[in-house]
UniProtKB/Swiss-Prot annotation:
The gene is purL. ATP binds at residues 307-318, 386-388, 678, 886. Pathway: Purine metabolism; IMP biosynthesis via de novo pathway; 5-amino-1-(5-phospho-D-ribosyl)imidazole from N(2)-formyl-N(1)-(5-phospho-D-ribosyl)glycinamide: step 1/2. This is Phosphoribosylformylglycinamidine synthase. GO terms for molecular function: ATP binding; metal ion binding; phosphoribosylformylglycinamidine synthase activity. Mg(2+) binds at D679, E718, N722, D884. Its EC number is 6.3.5.3. It comes from Salmonella typhi. Phosphoribosylformylglycinamidine synthase involved in the purines biosynthetic pathway. Catalyzes the ATP-dependent conversion of formylglycinamide ribonucleotide (FGAR) and glutamine to yield formylglycinamidine ribonucleotide (FGAM) and glutamate.
């Protein structure tokens, strides 16, 4: 039976207005829209009155409900029948944890009530299309239609392909019907293999073969033999990449054979809990560094949010599945798309060349894609710390004559670093009889054929297959799986994982054969043991779907009870689906039909399939010299600062958590004004050291339209000039990931790809001492479509994205572009040696030109000398600032440095030649250093010692004030206010935020950037930051116990434990499953802290599902109530823990006036470094801190304080229960965005109880208790930041 329960409004007022505007633009006469959530409960037995009331309360979440009279035509959007949404699985979990076992399943839809003039049936179809994602959702016309969500279909049988009867044609037909993307020689191979086996292939076997042997999975082009201009080439592309490792194997522990590469890290204290006692402690050992960068281009073109989200999720799984299990740590992201053409903000260089129907626009990609990637990282709990964004779309005269070049098929880059134990770097042996396990969520009928689909140019496959090949995301599930992997590797020698791979392209059909084959075994599997949410799926769909958040593992049979225990504690689903066999054979049995859908020797599937040969011709681009007739420097500056590649990226940065882990030493946002211009990202290796890891990106794709090899060399060079900002030491410590994107088969591109790979693999990297131990290729970067009577193609430039990774010797020495106004000198290091080439620059692009000669690496020895000199200067603390020269040239380098420093610049460029335009806008390698005036001679002397004398030019200095002045021999070349330039640079991000988020918030933020008087973040302390008030108590040797409480989806518990540990506590890991299972009680704890994250993925309201699992479970409710009523206890709730505890008001004495925390006013997840003041309150944790004003990490989507009415707010204030408030940079309490990131009234962001024993706050003090973890801080802070005082106060209070 199904029960229907109404929920809260689903759309904010500004979202409704945006939707109405979209309908008007499509000429659909819709006058009004109201949308609310509707819940559907599938019951196996009726609920009694008490249970009914409990369910009703469970489904009351989000902003307070206001009465609304429903009017208009109903369009009900629900998940697709036959699927179970991530929301459903988590909401059902919560219901069961609350004791409501009569509920088989909860599901949620959005009921849209549309008031419109008379619309035709076709127009109503258009309206419906605007309201749902056809990939994951459907539209019903009545609420009762939702019963279809709970219909269980009968399993479908396997089907065979009549090869023996119909011959080769049967395979050709199956190839088209199933979208297998098989080549002619592969069809021949399969015909021969199955004829030899004497039987017809099943569809599942062909599908499995196609996925496992797709270009996406097998990298056929990179392993191919090459003939160029009639001459056979000596090496494959992959062999040239491997040459970098053969030349420089230093520090590499694993390359080319696992899900990620591994290099040597630092010996530090890794902090985690003991399996038996739950007690957190430091474990001194090497934290080796793993690195991986993926792309997810095809799915992002079809459906950007899930495409980018699952791209990030897949790369995170690659990291976790390295060796015998590893820990993902920090991420990077990148996007290349065609022109944005923001409505009302179109730029002079943006022409509309059309696009295929099946893919979305560049604007859609950049609106939804970054949100999807960020949301996955946020919910998983991985900070996203660096990235790139390029737009390019133009008709150009390139290698193949005049043609359209751009990124209709986008690049969506997802990468990152992690850490791994030394004894887990290499995978173990799979013993015969080992249990073969799928860890993670159930199989669902989504993401079919992703590997094959990604291997085709867009437009070659059927549109329905394109949509079928996109996956969907459930990051909270992936977090649960990662917690299991963490528990395994933390066991050290007792790690039960022998072998692990992630499930990606091709689903289990690729992952399981790869697992057993890599382990030298075969596998015997049972299809129906695979967890599945859709009973009607065929064997092909169960085995080959690409449902996300899954891993395949081999675990020895005697270790299965331990593995089971770990999974149950973390609530991570798993299934044993087979056994490892001695014979390298793959068999899959189907219990339901008692047949054998797969019965193949592994060498048929993964053996010597036909090798590709590429026979290609070279084409050379001539280019045309830049026509500069109508270009003025003033206009060029304005245009270049509006090019999205150059323009401010705040809209891409603040949506992503940049502080989770408490180990982020350098994020994108720089200085007191938080300007996104950092050259590289830096993390600490641990919570007890200054060793670290760095990441940077280099990419100069448009240059490939003139010179393939130069583009590749520049990508390496740019990654190097970016990462040189931190203290690494030996250049051989730097390892690169190379991600190659090309339109294989397009005239000239294959030979160009070979040139580019050779340039870096055989020449530049070996000469520099750099290794490329990891990478990926995407060889189908072209879209085709019909525009009227014309067949069109959009081909991307050959695109190499280099990501550089390195061990850092001291994270405190990292430089930023933030200028200082003390007596200083600005020096240009011009590695272009005066060439000043303007081909394929931002300047050329904004004037719709390509130019002829591009930048290049002019002198490899000088590039190496630059890096070595920088390392000496960084270590000696001789530099005040550094910023590389890249897109937009020297002009943009200087402008961004001035923005970060909120100061003026006075420079003279006479020494750079008479061509001022070329001097300011060329994109040759190099950058600007700022030194103290007194150090200038010594720095120039040192640079000369490293062979850079002819590259160094004194420019001028940074000055206090607002003027940005460039002269040549004292004649003004360009002069403007820095604030004006800052506003120009910010307009793209402003317009994107207005479109995507609450426009009122976007306007407020843009206005703040135009305020030259803004003093920036600043600190006022009412206490001595260096006084350790907990020291006397620590000296006694007594360590009170704090329960570090987490629920599934919580991700900030480790740094929280570390902060309490430092203050003298024994931090104990307590999962809600421990409390619900009765394994742990709260009676032995002196303090309790509820940590941040996304419990249950914020399903049923942020923190609300977690709270209700406490309130509706009598025994656990009693545990909490007893704890809160016990004297001499302390409790802290942070972020998700704050939201959760605000819903436990009925259990916490003195909390009756606490507010609720609901969706941010911006309607967006906000990651900010915000200024707060400590107010007078009873809070015992904030004693002695009143009046202090300091920045703190903020990361939440639902942090806005909601009170019942004005009287409620007044009572909260008058009782003195407000503990922290947001203030602006002038020190005034504020409700203005973004100083107040969520719109809370009177800046309220923390409250306490009347006795001060329980304090809850939305910001994260635990993430910034170390000074190095603060995005900006005063120079005189030592190891501990002021926020450490909270935790020491806790220790002091307990005596």
């Amino acid at each position: 039976m199904m029960e229907i329960l109404r929920g809260s409004p689903a759309l904010s007022a500004f979202r409704i207005n945006k939707l109405l505007a979209r309908f008007q633009a499509a000429n659909l006469q819709v006058h009004n829209i109201y949308a609310e959530y509707v819940h559907f409960a599938d019951l196996n037995a009726p609920l009694n009155d008490s249970e009914q009331a409990q369910l009703t309360r469970l489904l009351q979440y989000g902003p307070a409900l206001s009465s609304h009279t429903l009017a208009g035509k109903l369009l009900l959007v629900t998940p697709r029948p036959g699927t179970i949404s991530p929301w459903s699985s988590k909401a059902t979990d919560i219901a069961h944890n609350c004791g409501l076992q009569q509920i088989d399943r909860l599901e949620r839809g959005v009921a849209y009530y549309i008031e419109a003039s008379t619309l035709t049936a076709e127009q109503w179809r258009q309206v419906a299309a605007e309201l749902h994602d056809r990939m994951m959702e459907t539209v019903f016309s009545s609420l009762t239609d939702a019963e279809k969500l709970f219909i269980h279909h009968q399993p479908a049988p396997v089907s065979s392909v009549d090869l023996l009867g119909e011959g080769r044609q049967a395979l050709i037909d199956a190839n088209l019907r199933l979208g297998l993307a098989l080549a002619e020689d592969e069809i021949d191979y399969l015909q021969e293999a199955f004829t030899k086996l004497g039987r017809n292939p099943n569809d599942i076997e062909l599908y499995m073969f196609a996925q496992a042997n797709s270009e996406h999975c097998r990298h056929k082009i990179f392993n191919a033999d090459w003939i160029i201009d009639g001459k056979p080439q000596p090496k494959s592309l992959f062999k040239m990449i491997k040459n970098t490792f053969e030349t420089t194997p230093d520090y590499v522990l694993s390359a080319y054979k696992d899900n990620a590469a591994v290099m040597e890290g630092s010996a530090v204290g890794r902090y985690f809990a003991d399996h038996n006692t739950g007690r957190y402690d430091f474990h001194q050992e090497p934290a080796h560094i793993l690195m991986k960068v993926e792309t997810h281009n095809h799915p992002t073109a079809i459906s950007p949010w899930p495409g980018a989200a699952t791209g990030s999720g897949g790369e995170i799984r690659d990291e976790g599945a390295t060796g015998r299990g590893a820990k993902p740590k920090a991420g990077l992201v990148g996007f290349s798309v065609s022109n944005l053409r923001i409505p009302g903000f179109e730029q002079p260089w943006e022409e509309d060349f059309g696009k295929p129907e099946r893919i979305v626009t560049a604007l859609d990609i950049m609106t939804e894609g970054p949100l999807g990637g960020a949301a996955f990282n946020n919910e998983f709990g991985r900070p996203a710390l660096t990235g790139y964004f390029r737009t390019y779309e133009e008709k150009v005269n390139s290698h193949n004559g005049e043609e359209l070049r751009g990124y209709h098929k986008p690049i969506m880059l997802a990468g990152g670093i992690g850490n791994i134990r030394a004894d887990h770097v290499q995978k173990g042996e799979i013993v015969v009889g080992a249990k073969l396990i799928v860890l993670g969520g159930p199989a669902m009928n989504i993401g079919l054929g992703g590997g094959a689909a990604s291997s085709m140019a867009s437009g070659q496959s059927d549109a329905d297959l394109d949509f079928a090949s996109v996956q969907r995301d459930n990051p909270e599930m992936e977090r649960r799986c990662q917690e299991v992997i963490d528990r395994c590797w933390q066991l050290g020698d007792a790690n039960p994982i022998l072998f692990i791979h992630d499930v990606g392209a091709g689903g289990l059909s690729n992952a399981m054969p790869e697992l057993v084959s890599d382990g030298g075994r075969g596998g015997k599997f049972e299809l129906r043991d695979i967890l599945s949410d859709e009973p009607g799926m065929s064997p092909l769909e169960i085995w080959c779907n690409e449902s996300q958040e899954r891993y395949v593992l081999a675990v020895a049979a005697d270790q299965l009870p331990l593995f089971d225990e770990l999974c149950k504690r973390e609530r991570a689903p798993y299934a044993v689906i087979g056994d490892a066999t001695e014979e390298q054979h793959l068999s899959l049995h189907d219990n339901h039909f008692d047949n054998q859908p797969i019965d193949l020797p592994l060498d048929v599937l993964l053996g010597k399939t036909p090798k590709m040969t590429r026979d290609v011709q070279t084409l050379k681009a001539k280019g045309d010299a830049l026509n500069r007739a109508d270009i003025t420097i003033a206009d060029a500056v304005n245009r270049v600062l509006h090019l999205p590649t150059v323009a401010e990226k705040t809209f891409l940065v603040t949506i992503g958590d940049r502080t989770v882990t408490g180990m982020v030493a350098r994020d994108q946002m720089v200085g007191p004004w938080q300007v996104p211009v950092a050259d590289c990202a830096v993390t600490t290796a641990s919570l007890d050291s200054y060793y670290g890891e760095a990441m940077s990106i280099g990419e100069r794709a448009p240059v490939a339209l003139l010179d393939f090899a130069a583009s590749a060399r520049l990508a390496v060079g740019e990654a190097l000039t970016n990462i040189a900002a931190t203290q690494i030491g030996d250049i051989k410590r730097i390892k690169l990931s190379a991600n190659w994107m090309a339109a294989a088969g397009h005239p000239g591109e294959d030979a160009g790809l070979y040139d580019a790979v050779k340039a870096v693999g055989e020449e530049l990297c070996p000469q520099l001492g750099l290794t490329i131990p990891v990478g990926k290729d995407s060889m189908s970067m072209k879209t085709r479509w019909q525009e009227g009577n014309e067949q069109r193609e959009m081909t991307s430039p050959l695109s190499l994205v280099i990501s550089a990774f390195a061990r850092v010797e001291d994270v405190r020495h990292t430089l930023t572009p933030q200028l200082s106004t003390e007596d200083n000198a600005l020096l240009l290091i011009d590695l272009g040696k005066g060439h000043n080439a303007l081909g394929a620059t931002a300047l050329a692009q904004v004037y719709r030109q390509l130019g002829d000669k591009p930048a290049d690496v002019r002198d490899v020895a000088q590039l190496k000398g630059f890096y070595d000199a920088m390392q000496v200067l960084v270590a000696a603390r001789k530099l005040l600032a550094w910023h590389d020269r890249s897109d937009g040239g020297l002009l943009v380098t200087l402008a961004e440095m001035a923005f970060a420093g909120h100061c003026g610049v006075q420079v003279d460029i006479a020494a750079l030649g008479d061509d001022h335009l070329a001097a300011l806008f060329n994109e040759e390698l190099g950058g600007v250093i700022q030194v103290r005036a007194e150090d200038r001679d010594a720095v120039e002397t040192l640079l000369a010692q490293y062979g850079l004398a002819d590259c160094v030019h004194y420019l001028g200095q940074a000055l206090a004030g607002d003027r940005f002045v460039i002269t040549a021999n004292d004649r003004t070349v360009f002069s403007e206010s820095r604030t004006t330039l800052r506003v120009w640079w910010a307009e793209t991000t402003w317009q994107m935020q207005r479109l995507r988020d609450n426009p009122q918030c976007a306007d407020q933020e843009h206005e703040a950037k135009a305020n030259d008087a803004d003093p920036g973040l600043n600190v006022k302390l009412s206490f001595d930051i260096n006084e350790d008030i907990a020291a006397p108590y620590i000296a006694t040797g007594a360590r009170p116990k704090v329960a570090v409480l987490r629920e599934q989806g919580v991700n900030s518990h480790v740094e929280m434990a570390a902060a309490f540990h430092r203050a003298g506590f024994d931090a104990i890991d307590v999962h809600m499953s421990d409390l619900l299972g009765g394994r742990i009680g709260l009676g032995n704890f002196h303090a309790l802290v509820a940590c941040g994250g996304f419990s249950y993925g914020d399903v049923l309201g942020a923190g609300e599902g977690w709270a209700k699992s406490i309130l509706f479970n009598h025994r656990v409710r009693d545990e909490f109530e007893t704890f809160f009523h016990r004297p001499q206890t302390l409790a802290l709730g942070v972020c998700n823990g704050c939201q959760m505890m605000s819903n436990l008001r009925e259990l916490i004495p003195g909390s009756e006036l606490w507010p609720r925390f609901v969706r941010n006013h911006s309607d967006r997840f906000e990651a900010r470094f915000s200024l707060v003041e400590v107010t007078q309150s009873p809070s015992l944790l904030l004693q002695g801190m009143v009046g202090s004003q300091m920045p703190i990490a903020v990361s939440h989507g639902e942090g806005r304080v909601e009170v019942r009415d004005d009287a409620h707010l007044a009572a909260l204030e008058s009782k003195g229960l407000v503990a922290l408030r947001y203030v602006d940079n002038f020190g005034k309490v504020t409700e203005t965005y973004p100083a107040n990131p969520n719109g809370s009234p009177n800046g309220i962001t923390a409250v306490t109880t009347e006795n001060g024993r329980v304090t809850i706050m939305m910001p994260h003090p635990e993430r910034v208790f170390r000074t190095v973890a603060n995005s900006w801080h005063p120079e005189n802070w030592g190891e501990d930041s002021p926020w450490m005082r909270i935790f020491r106060n806790a220790r002091k209070q307990l005596g």
